[in-house]
Design a protein with these regions (language model features):
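Patatin-like phospholipase
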Residues: 1-162
Length: 162
């Protein structure tokens, strides 16, 4: 298991749990990976400060390109290839950020496929995006997101598997 964070001094992605990465307990690694800018403070582990790995990549799937695995399941909640035209100004901003994240995931998936791996890509559909709203960190939407996922997940996975 790798837990992704970004070293705030170097800007490098750190896959805690991978050989060669700094040593950290799983609790420290999870806390470091949850240092989401503007929501949660950076976390110090062994004299280094870390923030959420999603700052550098929504999935860090590209780190598996040189691995010996044949298949990679990419869970990309911050990406979406769903075409929609939200009306709310805040939703329009959210979609711009999401489109940027999607281009990163597109590149990572292409790299994995180029290296011969089968990739199963799972990301939100239109119903999921509506449930998320413009702020995925909004605790008031948790129930709506959960209920929507109960409806959409099976079909989303079925479509991803092909």
């Amino acid at each position: 298991t790798w837990i992704m964070a970004v070293d705030t001094d170097s800007g490098k992605r750190i896959p805690f749990g991978k050989g060669g990465a700094p040593s950290a307990t799983i609790a420290d690694a999870v806390c470091a990976s949850y240092g989401v800018p503007f929501w949660c403070p950076p976390v110090t582990v062994a004299d280094r400060t870390y923030i959420d790995g999603g700052v550098a990549s929504p999935t860090s799937a590209d780190l598996l390109a040189d691995s010996a695995v044949d298949e990679v399941i990419v869970l990309a909640p911050m990406a979406s290839r769903q075409p929609d035209q939200p009306r709310s100004p805040l939703m329009k901003i959210e979609r711009r950020v999401r489109r940027y994240m999607t281009t990163i995931v597109d590149r990572e998936v292409a790299l994995l496929e180029k290296s011969g791996k089968r990739v199963i890509r799972i990301e939100p559909n239109a119903q999921d995006l509506n449930a998320f709203g413009y702020n995925m960190m909004d605790p008031k939407r948790r129930r709506q997101v959960y209920d929507t996922a109960q409806i959409t997940t099976a079909e989303t996975v079925r479509m991803a598997i092909g």
